[in-house]
């Protein structure tokens, strides 16, 4: 009986062999995948942005408000604790010279009361008689010379102060000038009690208009002293 030749079980040329993977990709449609991927991407972006915002607020250094910041404390010579000003030089000068009440009472005391004190009345010289007063009223009196006003206030010298024995001075006597100083030379500055800072007794007579004109002329808005 003749034997019929069997075909080889190997791959046959020209005939594509269908595989299981190709059948799976062909069967599953790709239409629903696109909206699902877009939804997942949107959710991921939302979580990333939220995490970045929370981290920025958590780790950001708070910026202090310049109007409410604490003053700077500085130790000066002599063991004094000073507070550095936070405003500009123009604001401080306008506040200083524009205030209605004096900020410093470093000036001469006001005129005494007409009656005076009991000690003043007791030590007062006897009053002059009436004829002498009538004669003095007939004599023309020259007005006293008024010294020219200075920009700075200074205490009156011994020659300029009127010597009145009927008044009792309550201000302490000033120290006498040293022997080594010449007459007319400026007095050396005196340190304040318990400090090395000088005690400046001169206070300028400057109005608020002059201060504003000075800053307008200088053209400076904020300069630190």
UniProtKB/Swiss-Prot annotation:
InterPro entries: DUF4689
Post-translational modification Phosphothreonine, affected residues: 113, 117
Compartment(s) of residence: Membrane
GO CC annotations on file: membrane
PTM annotation (Phosphoserine): residues: 195
The entry's keywords: Membrane, Phosphoprotein, Transmembrane, Transmembrane helix
Residue span of region Disordered: 106-163, 178-200
Bias (Low complexity): 122-140
Pfam family, one: DUF4689
Transmembrane intervals: 32-52
Topology within the bilayer: Single-pass membrane protein
Protein name, UniProt field: Transmembrane protein C16orf54 homolog
Protein's organism: Mus musculus
Organism taxonomic ancestry: Eukaryota, Metazoa, Chordata, Craniata, Vertebrata
